[in-house]
A protein has these predicted regions:
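A contiguous, well-structured "functional interface" segment within a domain
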Residues: 15, 35, 72
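Generic beta-structure capping elements
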Residues: 5, 23-25, 65, 160
């Protein structure tokens, strides 16, 4: 067992990745005002412009969590009405490229900031847990959403990605669903940088 754990890859890119808090916002949401929210928006836009201009950054994603942050989950229904508990990890299309997480079926569409739609991606473990063998005809809906609106339809699964270990290897693979949108705000920036350029990135 120890040897297996030492030699098991987590299933995602671990080299030349930096996780840094860059916005430093107060967690006391009651202190937020319209003016402070506008100021935050301006700071984030300026920060994005600086990151986009950095020649040592390959990709970045702002978030409230990194790839190893413990996630929460909820019950989803498949096309037979069967209930399955899935972990939820909010992501953008850049997340999968940043960590070299392989798409094994389907395609993760490019979603720009003007297009506010969200699509569903699952890992192999989630596809299996839902009772599907392919994304053809596969869809899901949150149990709570269906309970609130009996006429709500399933949302299609657009892609399946390779499994990876989200935490300790002994915890195994977790069936995970990824609501994928254009951008998710957060103080934590996950940055993939050019190999050998960490110092230059920090100095930038």
């Amino acid at each position: 067992q120890p040897g297996m754990l030492l030699n098991t890859e987590p299933g995602f890119r671990t080299k030349n990745i930096m996780n840094v808090n860059l916005v430093y916002e107060s967690k006391d949401f009651s202190s937020y005002t319209y003016e402070s929210m506008q100021q935050r928006r301006q700071r984030v836009m300026q920060l994005d412009n600086e990151l986009n201009a950095c020649p040592f950054i390959e990709l970045y994603e702002p978030s409230n969590e990194n790839i190893l942050t413990p996630t929460f989950g909820t019950n989803y229904l498949n096309n037979k009405g069967e209930k399955v508990f899935l972990n939820i990890h909010y992501a953008t299309p850049a997340f999968f490229k940043l960590y070299d997480i392989k798409v094994i079926e389907g395609e993760i569409p490019d979603i720009n900031k003007e297009n506010r739609r969200t699509v569903f991606v699952v890992n192999k473990a989630a596809l299996k847990a839902l009772g599907y063998t392919s994304i053809n005809g596969a869809g899901v809906i949150e149990e709570n959403q269906k309970r609130a609106n009996a006429n709500a339809s399933l949302q299609p699964i657009v892609a399946v990605v390779e499994d990876y270990f989200e935490g300790h290897l002994t915890s195994g693979i977790k069936p995970t669903i990824y609501p994928v949108g254009a951008r998710f705000s957060g103080d934590l920036y996950q940055i993939a940088y050019t190999p050998g350029k960490k110092k230059e990135l920090i100095d930038f």
